[in-house]
Curated annotation (Swiss-Prot):
Compartmental location: Cytoplasm
Enzyme kind, highest EC tier: isomerase
Residue ranges of every copy of the PPIase FKBP-type domain listed in the record: 166-250
Example of a GO biological process term: protein folding
Gene source species: Mycoplasma mycoides subsp. mycoides SC (strain CCUG 32753 / NCTC 10114 / PG1)
Protein name per the record: Trigger factor
GO molecular function terms listed in the Swiss-Prot or TrEMBL record: peptidyl-prolyl cis-trans isomerase activity
InterPro entries given in the database record: PPIase_dom_sf (IPR046357), PPIase_FKBP_dom (IPR001179), Trig_fac (IPR005215), Trigger_fac_C (IPR008880), Trigger_fac_C_sf (IPR037041), Trigger_fac_ribosome-bd_bac (IPR008881), Trigger_fac_ribosome-bd_sf (IPR036611), Trigger_fact/SurA_dom_sf (IPR027304)
Domain notes: Consists of 3 domains; the N-terminus binds the ribosome, the middle domain has PPIase activity, while the C-terminus has intrinsic chaperone activity on its own.
Lineage summary: Bacteria, Bacillati, Mycoplasmatota, Mollicutes, Mycoplasmataceae
Amino acid sequence: MIFAQEKFVDQGQGKWTVTIQDDQWTEFLKKAKNRLKTNLVVPGFRKGKAPESETAKYLTPIKIYNEAFKIVVKPAFDFALSQENKIQNDNSPTPVIVKVSDKEIVIDFIFDLVLELKVGEYKNITTVKKPVVEVNQEDVDNVIDMYRSRFAMQKEKQADDQIQKGDIVTFDFKGYVDDQAFEGGEAKDFVLEIGSNQFVPGFEDSMIGLKVGENQEINVKFPEEYIPSLAGKDAKFVLNIKNIKEKILPAKDDELVKDLNLPDITTYEQLEQKVKEDVLEQKTKISKSEFVENIIDEIIKTSEFQIPKTIIERQIKDVKKEFEDQLAQQKITLDKYKEITKITQEEIDEELKSDAIHRIKSFLVASEIKNKENIVASEEAINAKFEEFANLYGIEADKIKSLIDNQAIKHQVESELLETFIFENNGN
């Protein structure tokens, strides 16, 4: 017997190849033929007693090859196991006939690779710049304006008054693409705050200056990142302005603070400071997560992976389900999506596979770093996280513990610890 082996890392599989030739294979063919003859029933003869001239009519080469394969597959597999295997299998290999004739048989034993990871350098990576987070006055004003909106008064404008940013407008609209009305592009008595960016870019700005009673056409372009059926297309909207109300916000003073009734905040200056701190915390959290994702991408580049096919297929299935759910939410069929985007099923499958493999690699790298650095959530940290949720939702900690699984909290705490570790040990 002759042994060979090959690894297909991109497919998550390997194979052992065993070749049986010449006299050795001839012996297996004889055994197969004799076994078949023993159980062969030929009309006019007792079972297994027909002469060679008669059995030859029934025992075709294909039948003999198949029977010989059944006999040889176990010794061939045992032979493969006895060799110096540099490729370890993660499941029971599947035997496949590659080639068969009177002279030889070639059998492949195909199997999933064992999951392996050799993680690259994960400290002192300087190819990604550490973010600098700043909070400006506009950031603070935007949050405070949201607070002010809670207590805003609305005053109806006069007939000749024009729409301005911040106004509340009631109107009818109907949209057209290529002079054809499109689904979801029409509404009656729609209420919109101008400047809320609720509509596509340019829509609300085009309404500024219009008056009650005006029937006006406006032109916009849908963003490239939009519902596929409308993405990047020019559109026309016919508007009928019915009512305009001015939103009158309360002053930025201590009276606003009283109305908000926030804990430990009694003056407007304290409110501004608290908002600034909250915005800084939020921005820092977002930029930190983005930085860590970029660092993990860098670690992946220098790491070596061997991922079993079954794991890849399982992740592809999950990613595909997410993709299909997104299309369903947008009420678009897969065929329609392909028609709009001009991409093939093969391209979609390749993209989903690439996404799936990247997710697996990111998870493996994160898990390996966590193990190497012994990042484990302490009981104190877990309890502190429960307290954090309790304060957030205004529920007692014991009640929160009955609602949220302890393992889920442990996982979240460890994820945060890992993120902090990667953040503190990388960047410039």
